[in-house]
Curated annotation (Swiss-Prot):
Record's protein name: Large ribosomal subunit protein uL23
InterPro entries for this protein: Nucleotide-bd_a/b_plait_sf, Ribosomal_uL23-like, Ribosomal_uL23/eL15/eS24_sf, Ribosomal_uL23_CS
Domain of life assignment: Bacteria
Matches recorded under Pfam families: Ribosomal_L23
A single GO BP: translation
Record's keyword annotation contains Glycosyltransferase: no
Main function: One of the early assembly proteins it binds 23S rRNA. One of the proteins that surrounds the polypeptide exit tunnel on the outside of the ribosome. Forms the main docking site for trigger factor binding to the ribosome.
Keywords: Ribonucleoprotein, Ribosomal protein, RNA-binding, rRNA-binding
Coiled coil: none
Length: 100
């Protein structure tokens, strides 16, 4: 684990991503999260294992380039986003949708 998030692992995970592709990946025990763009794979693994009490077997990360957006005549950039696809060990799961 890197020193950047020492003791603050909850800051690594921003939110789960619920897209059509991410929902299909749930069948294979893979969960997609938006994470801090400075987070390394050991940080992400430690945060997921600590927050959700599961065993992580693999992580794939994607760091797409920032996209330009316009507001009238002003151009700006969207915030940097990093995605992580986390594979869990057999028998582990994360409850993303609370049962009511």
């Amino acid at each position: 684990m890197t020193e950047r998030f020492q003791g603050r692992l909850a800051d690594v995970i921003r939110r789960p991503l619920i897209t059509e592709k991410a929902t299909r990946a749930l069948e294979f025990n893979q969960y997609t999260f938006e994470v801090d763009h400075r987070a390394a794979k050991p940080d992400i693994k430690a945060a997921i294992e600590q927050l959700f009490d599961v065993k992580v077997t693999g992580i794939s990360t994607m760091n797409p380039p920032r996209r330009t957006r316009r507001m009238g005549r002003f151009a700006g950039k969207r915030a940097q986003v990093k995605k992580a696809v986390v594979r869990l060990a057999e028998g582990n799961s994360i409850q993303l949708f609370p049962e009511s």
